[in-house]
Amino acid sequence: MKIFFLIYFVLTIPVFGQVFNGMTLFSPAQGGGGGGNFYSYLVDNEMNEINTWTHPRGPASMPYLLPDSTLVYPYRVPTPSMNAGGTGGGISKYSWDGDLLWDHVISNSNYQHHHDVEPLPNGNILVIAWEMKTAEEAYAVGRQSIDNSLNVMWAEAIFEIEPVGSDDVNIVWEWHIWDHLIQDVDPDLPNYGVISDHPELQDINYGSAGSNGGPGGANGDWKHLNAIAYNEELDQIAISSRHHDEIYIIDHSTTTEEAAGHVGGNAGKGGDYLYRWGNPQAYGRGNTSDHLLDDQHGVNWIPEGYPGEGNLILFNNNYTNNSAVFEIVTPLNDDGTYAISEGQPYGPGEPLWLHTGNFHTQMQGGAFRLPNGNTIVTDCDDATIFEVTHDHEEVWSYDHGAGQVFIARAQKYELNYLG
């Protein structure tokens, strides 16, 4: 395998300046995720192999390296119960030596894992999943149309799972968007209200309920969540919706019962949105000039001690004719809520820091702040990873250069990260 690796990466072109000295982790994938073996690579700045893991199935998103050297790998199952862009279904844990420690599949008639996961400090894992809803269930809560021949609507759920044994889980917490809806079309149906008065709720009629095209054919994909991140200090979760051009923050300090309602948790709001940003027209506020996100991916908090700590950073896939990285300062209050003026959208009105250039991807993509203030960026479609300074100087780059291959997102870890 090592000989293969060295040949495979002959096209690597590192550029050195103020580059952060760390270890980069990524999992290249072919579209569809089937056929042959797949690999996760951990490399240094000169693309020397530190470790490689082999997988029988292609990645759904990016892998995660834990401080104990365990690799968490979300992957695409062969026959998903719900199939659209970003379909996953399986989550594996591997030892440093490549032994499979645990493997669990979430792909059934009710739920289908897709895209991202987020390992938690307590050893549990947050998982994004589509939740199957029939047209009748959608109409019963005020949905006006179903936009696919399957006559279904895929809602979204988040599960916190505790790995058990070699292939089982305990579900220790869960959240469902279906518990936080609003509609303004029928006062005789549940959740009736004025959309713009309730930015904490999701308009059931915003956006299309799936389509008859795209990867996998007809689907009920409504919001298309594509990334999830966790902030331990706040005990909050950030998620990204490509189809609605928004990012959201919800409270994780709630019980599962509280997460299904509108009160409880540290912020006192239950499972309602604490914050949302990118497209305030989705909740009846603002105008087209406030619509700042377009098909974004990869939202995450900048860690404590890093330049910009506590801010959110994300990959905005469509910005003018390219893609861009946004860093935003959220209007966080001391009590864990987020400030918003009556009738106005959530701030900020613009990013604190924005990096763009000659890169553009329609699929996935991501950005992470590094300890020295640099940012590592992944152009998914071009299978390219690069590092830029705060002043927009590109100091390191890598082009996978392997044809019909993409890299969802890459992360870079400190050299002393592993315990």
Features from the language model and the residues they span:
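Histidine-/acidic-rich catalytic cores in large beta-rich domains
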Residues: 17-419
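Short linear sequence motifs
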Residues: 1-2, 168
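Sec-dependent N-terminal signal peptides
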Residues: 3-14
